[in-house]
């Protein structure tokens, strides 16, 4: 009886790219669930608070608006980060078999934290601003759509206008700068940079960058679609939290 090491190795061979895309599919699904489920989660919180008249009680306590808003955002972040924690076993196996370094998992956790903070801040602001849950839900959906889809539509309009004016396929420098600015306002830009960083800036990411005149092989791409977009996302979340606190204090005075 002979031991054939070559046959053994062939029998246990696997395609690392399949595990790589398994990791990306799971992470993309998690990010998508944040934006889809967030309005429903916050709606449930505020519906319960209004039924128990907790909002009126908090409004009567000076300085409680800040504590209430921060507490709500913190609870929502904790709930959605459990989605990331629960997927760690599968994600870890995907990293092991695809050869991805462990820091990619850490980056995914940071991306989920940033996206959750951004979406939760907008949702808390919407439900603090509108007294009717259905109007708050509609406002929340409209604001998120404006930043996620509206910025993409704006870049496409700028691109088409630049091409029609110059008559060339390449965009004017001012058009490229405007497209970069609108891309920074899109919370998915940070995740798109994360996705492109893993896959080598290929596929949809490369196509999008090529259409708006951004070279995905430069350092500008790495800074714009990963670091700067994440910072802008955090700053927008802080701004919406400040607006929610201001709105609750305004309602308390009325």
Please provide the spans of the model-predicted regions.
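Hydrophobic alpha-helical transmembrane segments in multi-pass membrane proteins
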Residues: 1, 32, 75-92, 112, ...
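Terminal transmembrane helical anchor/hairpin motif
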Residues: 3-17, 149-239, 243
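Membrane-interfacial helix-loop-helix connectors in multipass membrane proteins
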Residues: 9-20, 89-113
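Long, hydrophobic alpha-helical segments
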Residues: 22-48, 52
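Hydrophobic/aromatic residues in alpha-helical transmembrane segments
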Residues: 38-42, 90, 121-122, 244
């Amino acid at each position: 009886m002979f031991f054939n090491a070559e046959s053994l190795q062939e029998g246990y061979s696997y395609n690392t790219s399949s595990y790589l895309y398994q990791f990306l599919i799971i992470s993309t699904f998690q990010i998508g669930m944040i934006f889809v489920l967030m309005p429903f989660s916050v709606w449930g919180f505020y519906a319960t608070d209004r039924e128990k008249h907790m909002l009126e009680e908090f409004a009567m306590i000076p300085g409680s608006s800040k504590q209430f808003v921060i507490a709500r955002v913190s609870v929502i972040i904790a709930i959605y980060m459990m989605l990331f924690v629960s997927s760690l076993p599968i994600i870890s196996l995907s990293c092991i078999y695809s050869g991805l370094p462990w820091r990619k998992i850490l980056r995914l956790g940071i991306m989920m934290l940033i996206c959750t903070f951004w979406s939760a801040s907008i949702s808390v602001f919407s439900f603090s601003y509108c007294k009717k849950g259905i109007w708050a839900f509609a406002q929340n959906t409209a604001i998120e759509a404006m930043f996620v889809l509206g910025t993409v539509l704006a870049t496409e309009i700028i691109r088409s206008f630049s091409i029609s004016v110059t008559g060339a396929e390449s965009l004017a420098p001012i058009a490229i700068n405007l497209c970069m600015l609108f891309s920074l306002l899109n919370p998915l830009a940070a995740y798109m940079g994360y996705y492109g960083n893993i896959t080598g800036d290929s596929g949809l990411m490369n196509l999008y960058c090529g259409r708006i005149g951004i070279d995905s092989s430069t350092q500008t791409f790495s800074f714009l679609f990963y670091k700067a977009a994440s910072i802008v996302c955090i700053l927008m979340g802080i701004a919406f939290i400040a607006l929610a606190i201001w709105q609750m204090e305004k309602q308390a005075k009325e």
